[in-house]
């Protein structure tokens, strides 16, 4: 019998924030970006999720040599803190050139900008000795369907994947699907779409998925089933665990904060599939409540990590013989009651 997985956790520096939202300004003092890395180990985290401009600020204004210099400096910072860069993601949704999309923009000049920015992100990942690029295809979609040729858009996405795989012969690409926001309807809305693109690529073994709980919920799907699908194909590069209270804007609530049973099932699928045993991180993408005072605010991170580990113990202490008995008898009423009682800690 294999030994239990010793999970490692990651988050991005943006998860320590000032609490601004579309309806109001900051409510907390800013905590300096460069000081956030010193918090990770104290909070129980070993991995750092990075946007390209988290790693190298203002990179569009820098030369390749300057980008390399800045990335190398961050590599030293992370090493000194005992941290591992989990991935680098090109932040392709802020620039004026990406208003109408990035790789699927109708403008050839805008597509060229997106490709140039992507190459810079890969260069940063190389400098950090980071093995993965995450593609959140944020603005790849439309507000009205007639705005783009969808077939051509998907062809362009596949061509971009192949170009990335050719640009770096070892980098992995993890596609992070989301069905909406900031576009009305996005291309590659689910992990099934992402894995289909992976298999169509020139080196599918290096193309995987990153599943965020809230994104799956926003697609009307169960996050644990999405994870199971990716795991069955050997294509779950990472996860962004959080929660979502209904079909609305992306909330990034604390993991388990809206649906504890759904959180349990995500942990169950990951644990039973051996996720993490090959070094994969358990990534969190959670926002502190706007009402939370302090600087820096980090309880949402430690609370979500703690809840994950509590649910791991719930999975490991399930009576598997009883579960098998209920399954064999097709007595799912009894199975459900057992699961609910187990989660509540009552007999």
What spans do the regions from the language model cover?
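Substrate-binding cleft and catalytic face of glycoside hydrolase catalytic domains
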Residues: 81-100, 133-144, 179-182, 186
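Short loop/turn segments at strand-loop or loop-helix junctions that form parts
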Residues: 12-16, 51-54, 89-93, 135-140, ...
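Surface-exposed, active-site-proximal loop segments in enzymatic domains
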Residues: 19-25, 54-69, 94-112, 137-151, ...
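Glycine-rich, aromatic-flanked loop segments that form ligand/cofactor-binding clefts
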Residues: 4-12, 71-95, 124-126
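Active-site loop/lid in soluble adenylation, ligation, and acyl-transfer enzymes
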Residues: 45-57
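Aromatic- and glycine-enriched glycan-recognition loops and surfaces
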Residues: 28-36, 61-75
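Histidine-acidic metal/acid-base catalytic patches
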Residues: 2-46, 119, 123-126, 131, ...
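Catalytic-core regions built around general acid/base machinery
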Residues: 67-82, 160, 164, 269
């Amino acid at each position: 019998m294999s030994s239990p997985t010793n999970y490692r956790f990651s988050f991005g520096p943006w998860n320590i924030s000032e609490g601004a939202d579309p309806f109001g300004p900051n409510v907390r003092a800013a905590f300096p970006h460069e000081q956030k890395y010193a918090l990770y180990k104290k909070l129980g985290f070993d991995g750092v999720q990075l946007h390209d401009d988290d790693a190298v600020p203002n990179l569009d204004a820098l030369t390749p040599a300057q980008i390399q210099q800045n990335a190398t400096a961050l590599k030293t910072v992370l090493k000194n803190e005992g941290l591992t860069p989990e991935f680098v993601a090109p932040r392709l949704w802020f620039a004026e050139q990406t208003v109408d999309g990035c790789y699927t923009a109708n403008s050839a000049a805008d597509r060229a900008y997106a490709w140039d920015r992507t190459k810079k992100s890969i260069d940063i990942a190389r400098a950090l000795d980071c093995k993965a690029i995450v593609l959140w295809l944020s603005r790849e979609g439309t507000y009205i369907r007639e705005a783009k040729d969808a077939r051509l858009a998907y062809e362009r996405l596949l061509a971009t994947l192949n170009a990335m795989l050719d640009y770096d012969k070892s980098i992995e690409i993890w596609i992070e699907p989301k069905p909406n926001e900031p576009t009305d309807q996005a291309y590659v809305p689910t992990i099934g779409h992402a894995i289909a693109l992976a298999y169509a690529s020139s080196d599918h073994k290096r193309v995987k998925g990153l599943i965020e709980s809230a994104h799956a919920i926003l697609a009307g799907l169960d996050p644990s089933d999405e994870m199971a699908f990716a795991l069955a194909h050997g294509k779950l590069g990472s996860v962004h665990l959080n929660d979502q209270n209904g079909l609305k804007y992306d909330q990034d609530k604390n993991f388990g904060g809206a649906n504890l049973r759904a959180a349990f099932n995500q942990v169950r699928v990951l644990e039973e599939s051996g996720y993490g045993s090959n070094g994969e991180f358990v990534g969190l993408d959670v926002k502190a409540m706007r009402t939370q005072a302090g600087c820096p605010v980090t309880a949402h991170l430690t609370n979500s990590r703690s809840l994950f580990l509590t649910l791991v113990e719930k999975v490991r202490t399930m009576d598997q013989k009883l579960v098998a008995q209920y399954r064999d008898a097709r007595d799912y009423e009894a199975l459900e009651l057992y699961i609910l009682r187990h989660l509540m800690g009552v007999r």
